[in-house]
Structure formats: C-alpha cells, structure tokens
Swiss-Prot record:
A lipid is attached at residue 25 (N-palmitoyl cysteine). It holds the Pfam family COX2. It is a multi-pass membrane protein. A lipid is attached at residue 25 (S-diacylglycerol cysteine). InterPro entries: CcO_II, CcO_II-like_C, COX_ARM, Cupredoxin, CuRO_UO_II, Cyt_c_oxidase_su2_TM_dom, Cyt_c_oxidase_su2_TM_sf, Cyt_o_ubiquinol_oxidase_su2. One of its GO terms (cellular component) is plasma membrane. Residues 25-42, 109-290 are extracellular. Its main location: membrane. The keyword Membrane applies. This is Cytochrome bo(3) ubiquinol oxidase subunit 2. It comes from Buchnera aphidicola subsp. Schizaphis graminum (strain Sg). The chain crosses the membrane at residues 43-63, 88-108. Residues 1-24 form the signal peptide.
Amino acid sequence: MISINFNNFFKTLLLILIAFTLHGCDSILFNPHGIIAIQECSILLISFLIMLFVIIPVIFMTIYFSVKYRASNINAKYKPDWCDSKKIEIIVWTIPISIILFLAFVTWNYSHILDPKKSIISKYKPIKIDVVSLDWRWLFIYPEYHIATINEIMFPINRSIIFHITSNSVMNSFFIPSLGSQIYAMPGMMTTLNLMSNSPGKYKGISSNYSGKGFSNMKFTAISVLNIKDFENWIKKAQQSPKKLNKMSIFNIISLPNENHFIEYFSDVKKNLFYEIINQTYSKNKVFKH
C-alpha cells in the first residue's frame, strides 16, 4: 500500500510556488517600455489568466481526489459500474472549447493590431533607421541624417521608429525586448518593423536567431531620450566622425566577420547604401526596388 505524507506534499508545493514568485530575475517581457511591448505583455497576461481556468481546477481535483479516494478512507463510495456523467461531459467539453474560441479571437485581433508593418500614430515625424545584420554586429543607417553607427541607436521617446531590416550574411533576428516585436533579417530581402518607446532609458538589443560563433555577443544598445536636444547632439557627434561610409568598398571591409565589435560612428554615408547592400546579396539578374 502506498501512503502519502500530505504535510510534506503541501510544504514542497509551497516552496515551489515561493521559488517562482520570489525569484530575483528581471523579466524584460513583463517590464515593457514601448507601446508595442505593452500590448504584447497584455496578450501574455490574458492567455495566462485564461489558462488558469483549466490549470487551477485540475490541480484542485488532483489534490481532492487523491485525498478523498485514498486507500485509508473507508467512507468513500465505491462505484465499480459507474461509466458516464452528462454533467462532466458538458463541463470538460464546454470550457476548453470556450477557451480556444476566446484565445483564437484574441490572437486574430492582436495579429492585426500588432502587424509589424503597421504605422504607429504619433504627432511627431517618424524616424527611419535602416538595419543591416553583419557577422556579428549590427549596422544602423540614418538615411535622413546621412550617418551610420555600429551597435548603438538613439531616438526620442514618443516618436515612431520605422526600421527597415536586412542581412548581409545569414538569416538573423532583430529584437529589442523592452520595446516590442522581433523580426527576421534576411539577405536579399527587406522586412519592416515599427516601434515606439514611451519612457527614456537604455535598452538591450539582441539577435534572437543563431547565426554562428559570434552570435551570443551580437548585442547593441537602444537609447531612448526624453530631450530632443540629446538626440540632436548625438546626431551631430556622428556627423563629425572622421570615419566615412560613402563607398561600397568601405562597407565590404567593415562587414567582414568580427566579434565583440565596439560602438562606431560614420559620417557621409552613401545614398541608398541600404538598398545596394540588399542588391549585393540578391540575384544578379534582379534588382531590388524601393
């Protein structure tokens, strides 16, 4: 006969719950700083709360049945011929179907609301940033300011940011967890991502798709500033850089594989460099048009 020590069982369960509740890790996804990230966090919380309608009753019934029908309980009713219950059938089918339908509606609705190509409404003019995934760092081009940077971007809060993204090497993934969605960077193609920060700070940007030996350190910093003057000063700093990026030959040199690359600024960036990079990795018989 198997005996269960329920005191130890509940103590263990309590310790597990405490471990999950009081862990010291900072969950970036649940500490959003952008309007897209806030909505994505809402989806996770809604899905979690809905799934509790399944999880909590199952946990409760598991504990209840194990106690009620334990071998030592002589008062439990023994029904060897029981095989059907309309009430149970209704419950076990109605609740899961309702949950699936609700989650399907939420998914469909938010898939359209959070379309990465969908523009974010703002009273300020959006900032365009062209993003190129290199081995193993990120090149950012500000076409309107004729500057480029490696592993650092800056933008004001409450300003829509339009990212045009490609890769000069293998497929990669562009992701700023605090601000919102990740999107793939693919050679010979362009993807679009719209984000907006609603609070100042420095946010970690990463590659979330394995791309070789330098992948783990393929990080960048996204700086969101409250004062537009800080952004303008940062732009001027880059425009005064002695390093230029006005030729494809220069780009081909800086795009060579390199790990743990430092932050770098370039002035005098070649016009339409981003699209030339795409065409360089595209079919020779086709030209990418923008």
